[in-house]
Swiss-Prot record:
Protein name stated in the entry: Gamma-glutamyl phosphate reductase
A GO MF label: NADP binding
EC number: 1.2.1.41
Pathway listed: Amino-acid biosynthesis; L-proline biosynthesis; L-glutamate 5-semialdehyde from L-glutamate: step 2/2
Reactions the enzyme catalyzes: L-glutamate 5-semialdehyde + phosphate + NADP(+) = L-glutamyl 5-phosphate + NADPH + H(+)
Organism: Erythrobacter litoralis (strain HTCC2594)
One GO process term, biological-process aspect: L-proline biosynthetic process
Pfam name, any one: Aldedh
This protein's UniProt keywords: Amino-acid biosynthesis, Cytoplasm, NADP, Oxidoreductase, Proline biosynthesis
Amino acid sequence: MNDQTLDPAIHIQQLGTAARDAARGLVSASTEAKNKALMEAARALREATPALLEANARDVASVEGKKDEAFIDRLKLDEARVEGMASALEQIAELPDPVGRVLAQFDRPNGLRIERVAVPIGVIGMIYESRPNVGADASALCLKSGNAVILRGGSESRHSTREIVACMQAGLKAAGLPENAVQTVQTTDRNAVAELLKADEHVDLVIPRGGRGLVELVRDQASVPTLLHLDGNCHSYVHEAADVAKAVDVVRNAKLRRTGICGATESVVVDRVIAPALILALADAMAGDCELRGDETAVQLDDRITPASEDDWNTEYLGPIASVKVVDGLDEAIEWVEGHSSHHTDAILTEDAEAARRFMTAIDSAIVMHNASTQFADGGEFGMGAEIGIATGKMHARGPVGLEQLTSFKYLVHGSGQTRE
């Protein structure tokens, strides 16, 4: 298809109409049929590996010399990554079906029995950047939760995305489910994104997954409801009652296990009482692996720490850099974290249970941890299976967005002829 000949408004309307029809077909789909579709899609991915890698090579070639190595690495597929996508589909097939769960039930004095039951949201628009596997994961999660999905991946990954969608549609067809339950926007025209964001008639929810620029664009332009994931400016606060060795071990992992994920700690907040010992041990542990940028106190305590700028306190580095802030006690730490966190994930390191309770109550983030690495901010680590992202807002879903969060609910009211006076 020549995507440059497509009118974005008409194209999105056509995709939306087809997706809405498919969503109606998925509402009554059995768990067995959805699982079969996922297993068949996994098989199709494995069989299509040569074609998928060829398509991906075209995508990579189109950005070489224009994008940095980190971007190209996120875009690039190899046999191991394709196998990882296929395995992820099989794992999602093994998860419990979230649709049809009875969330609550109660009997009224007039004899009515009322049930609150989980149902699919309907049609989901997924807008993401360069990683092709996001399209596979999102498609699988939407399918298992009974939702149709319209994918709009980055233009750099368009050839890879089309191959992945073809495999998903093959799985749907094999299971007797609507093939249009998984579709991709076929044009690279950016106006298509704007059209998707205002397609209220056809799309029930839009989920962006990518950098701050993408998320802010969706937030500012969407009339469709959204699940937003802003950047992960995550904090690890070392309280005065922390075990220094334990705290340093946790903070090092929180920063360096994978620096490019949204759950990586970007800022270390340290109580003044414990700062001399903690900062020396932290600088030793990070030496050669991570640049530390600190406030005046931190710099005075260890000359391996360079002065931080005001921007450092609000920066998601996504690399081997961390800021270090020294505070006077728990109250100042709470005030500092609340003032600079992106409200994704924040942690306290302490052996004082009351201090931990106060911090975890006061910090208004989607995930708050005690004596654990912020890198555990992940749906898989929460036992939820795969995730479609981390929601940092407060409406509908918050934290890891897995199968359960991709459902809504409705009330089923059973009577025996009751009439209301």
